[in-house]
From Swiss-Prot:
BP GO terms, sorted: L-leucine biosynthetic process
The gene coding this protein: leuD
Organism, as annotated: Xylella fastidiosa (strain 9a5c)
Keyword Phosphoprotein: no
Protein name: 3-isopropylmalate dehydratase small subunit
Quaternary structure annotation from Swiss-Prot or TrEMBL: Heterodimer of LeuC and LeuD.
Annotated pathway: Amino-acid biosynthesis; L-leucine biosynthesis; L-leucine from 3-methyl-2-oxobutanoate: step 2/4
PANTHER family for this protein: 3-ISOPROPYLMALATE DEHYDRATASE SMALL SUBUNIT, 3-ISOPROPYLMALATE DEHYDRATASE SMALL SUBUNIT 2-RELATED-RELATED
Superkingdom, taxonomy of origin: Bacteria
Amino acid sequence: MKPFTQHTGLVCPLDRVNVDTDQIIPKQFLKSIKRTGFGPNLFDEWRYLDAGQPGQDNSKRPINSDFVLNFPRYRGASVLLARDNFGCGSSREHAAWALDEYGFRTVIAPSFADIFFNNSFKNGLLPLVLNKVEVDALFAQCQVTEGYTLTVDLAAQQVITQDGTTYAFQIDTFRKHCLLNGLDDIGLTLQHAEAIRVFEAAHRIRQPWLFAPLH
């Protein structure tokens, strides 16, 4: 998992409440067991005017020019600004995969659905909670400033805007450690690889019959 220490990026404002995981990545794209290939279909039903299907050439599909992600000014955005209850709906981990693969490093919102919130941390995507007044201020700045960027400093737990305004945010200490060091569940387990090896060797000595070949 890619570490998250400090990130400066273009902000894309998604001014909708209760964005659910089926809107983030529609159900027809969930057949793959791989963690890649979902970015091109992020917000598929909003980005395109036709019904998307797996394996389509998206470059030939009609674009919804009224959807914010298709605005030229937000191309290359890596910070998604959202509203309350982002990521509600089903528990699909693909939603975090799609956002990450598209290029978003963080989603800033007043609140998140619990399962999406947890899935994001496990996949290197920072779900960052600011209060409604602070989020409203960021939306206002996005509207009046083309090319609006901000910096998220995870170590300092601060959002730093273009004019130098800072917003502090809270994050669980363990989750912060994992993001700073790029540790997913596998990475955390591998930190204890030597202890696991020692345990398995001792286990084989204590209970050798468990490892005897079957006849």
